[in-house]
Amino acid sequence: VTDLPATLDLPTALVVLPGGKSAVADAGPARELRPPYARELIQEAPVLVAHAAMTARRLGLNAPGRSRRILDALELYAFVRPARFTAPSAAGLALALGLPEPRGVAAQAQALREVCRILLAELAATPWPSREEALVLAETLDRGGWSWGAAVIGALRSQPIKHSPRGSGLEVWSRIPEWEDQAPAGEPGSKPIDPEAAGRRLDELLQRAGLDEARASQKVFAAETAWAFQPREREGEPRMMLAEAGTGVGKTMGYLAPASLWAEANGPAVWVSTYTRALQRQIERESAGIFPDPAVRARKVVVRKGRENYLCLLNFQESVNAAQLGNGDLVGLGLTARWARASRDGDMTGGDFPAWLPSLFAVAPAVQASAGNLVDRRGECVHAGCVHYRACFIEKAVRGSKHADIVIANHALVMSQAAFDGARTARGLKGDNETTSLRRIVFDEGHHLFDAADSAFSAALSGAESAELRRWIRGPEGRGRRGRGLEARLMEIVGDREAARDALQDAIHAAAALPGEGWSGRIAPPDGQVNPLGPIEAFLVAVIEQLRARAAPGDQGLEAAARPATDLVRDTAALAAAALARVEAPLLALARHLEDLLDEETDELPTSDRARIEGALRGLDRRARMTLPGWRSMLKAIEEDAEDDPDFVDWFDATFLYGRVVDAACRRHWVDPTEPLTAAVIAPAHGILVTSATLADSTLDDPFALAEMRTGAARLPERPQTLRLQSPFDYAANTRAFVVTDVGKDDPRQVAAAMRELFLAAGGGGLGLFTAIRRLKAVHERIAAPLADKGLALYAQHVDPLEVGALVDIFRAEEDSCLLGTDAVRDGVDVPGRSLRLLVFDRMPWPRPDILHKARRQRFGGKGYDDGLARARLAQAFGRLIRRADDKGVFVMLDAAAPTRLFSGLPEGVELQRVGLVEAIEATAAFLARG
């Protein structure tokens, strides 16, 4: 590493592990430090840390504000290596720079200094013109109080500067390449795919990726799934296939082989839909086998997400302007500018944006440089009316997806887009111009289709949702708030069309009846003195009153059936429905005026104006033709105290925060969401492949019966094709599974002690899964310090100030760390190797018996339905343990009452043993020690 100038001397490095164990490193050897001295150091002295907020929290302190005293190595990494991955810890940084994993707190403190020296030396070697670009931004951030300012400027000025930099460096929108329009790609073709050619393509892909030749099961998978890419025979009857491929078969490459052949012959495009971000990233990586050239791959493989995932350059510019006037996080925005310049696609919620960046210091949530403030969550986009339209990340992704061979998306986007297109088609309009026809779809992680459809095809009238609608129509009404209402977005478009202007003003006036600023404090104040403004808030107050009268308090809030409703709920529902009708009518009128404008002036409209109108119509359609009618339908049923519709479940619930109600909602879900899923997504498609490692259920006479019901396949005229391939892994040799029979699952002390000793027996690498947040926190409180004393770091969802993806990144990077999470975490954990070698459930993951689940259990088979869901959850969790042929893992259930029949979904060769805790601990230690 290049020696640094004396002016760049680093302060003392401080690392604090979960549990409070601390160490410091300066010019001499690293040494451990007692917590009181560590607290004094971070509060008073210059100090170098990795994640200031998490470091302070482990010492029992609040997150510090920005200070020139506290240098966070993660900020330096974000500046020097923007849009490049690191786990947000000292060990994670060391691994990201190619250093060996530092084990133990003292080694991590020493490594932290070395990491910063390497990064500053790397910065000193930055070539022109990147050096000038970095320098101008660093000088701006230094004036804004950035603790790394002097060190970064010193490194950049260690070599001559060719040109004097100009500007602030924050104007990233002026340096992002613009997109270019292309001719329409046309509709996809229907040429068949040869199964043998799919096998040959698989061999090519594996060879390009530098992998071994295909396993026999992988070749079978590629050839058999080609069936879903053949031409369909009849309208409304897609070629649908359910394919279970056990872990290790290689299903991703297996379906990319026929998908890429089909796209070459017929495209665009095959849509590959996933449930988790981790799998999206994996598919994108594996697509390198199809298109080795990065430039070609960028055109041919596009990750497509909803607008609410991408950095909005206009929001960013407005935030920068505010921060330069003293109202914002200038440093955070500067680091975000560095990221945006380097980002592959501007995705802030699962792409290359460091999600840990906004949480490093105590910054008010409203001004953080976070996705919540910088993406277009509120549908406020002005489309071609935006000065950054040609550089827009969202527009770039939209256009890219129209011409790509493979579009990688998520279940939510595919379903919402299909539902929207279906609604437009039903009115005789063309589909959304943002998306190509969804002719061929691969649903990976297909076991989540039911849950994704449940979310996509539901309705919720809540304080937050209705307040968001008010803001979308009227714009921000508080002081200093950013945003754009309908008037700002549309007045220029409607021009002198008096009827359209009147409709716009009527909508703005009617929206005043929706909840406004401070609504939560009025409907559920801490002192109980409610003061609702308007009919929607009055309805929500009545809902909360009914909930308190009828609901049993639970861990996650209150819920009660919507009907029979109290007199107050019925009366306020009628008034709320009338208010919503007054909002809906002018929005519909405005939509019709805009449709007329497109029709009547089609030969005169500039392309930019057409894009603005079509964008406005998308927002109006979703709200005036989908959301508002859904809300009014729910309210009408409540007002009339109607008989329950057998296809729907209506209920009320309340949201709690810090122990008190902050919102209430009226919800409507389909009992069977595969009905709209089939109508909107599956039936219009030509070919559907649903795949997962856990689709079938061996305990059923027909192993795919439950999967057919939960994917919509059972609703098609013809049964789907099915394929089932076993995992090639040797589970009998590489796994152990225990049910512990002598731990009281309802005693937090016993559960904590059991989990602690199991984690110690494994030497770390343990994942603890809980079915309730309360129990997770209770266990964490009891075991974090004892594990830290033994050198094992314990991270926890809902405890550490990081989103779960960042926690999983740390868990993956630090081989001997442990992680606690809710049962839902199992879906996002893709951790091969020794980092995950022990998985412990606190109790059986039964489905929560809420109102919605009770209705489904009655519809779908009672106890057998519950068993099927629990069995699948166990199988999915077990599948996290073994990701490669040489992995070893232990599965432990701490619920003695767990029925043996539910473990029948575990892979062939796994033997379930019911043992006492001591025996489980000894067996875990002995088995993993052999690996």
Please name every model-derived segment.
Residues 773-798:
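Conserved helicase motor "Helicase C" RecA-like lobe of SF1/SF2 P-loop NTPases
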Residues 728-746, 799-899:
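Conserved RecA-like P-loop NTPase helicase motor core
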Residues 234-258:
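Walker A/P-loop
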Residues 89-159, 891:
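Acidic, Mg2+-coordinating catalytic module of metal-dependent nucleases/exonucleases
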Residues 11-123:
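Conserved DEDDh/DEDDy metal-dependent 3′-5′ exonuclease domain
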Residues 192-203, 268-269, 274-405, 412, ...:
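A substrate-engagement module of RecA-like helicase motors
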Residues 190-243:
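Conserved pre-motif I regulatory segment
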Residues 371-402, 418-429, 596-741, 747-749, ...:
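A contiguous, basic/glycine-rich beta-loop/short-helix subdomain that forms a polymer-engagement track
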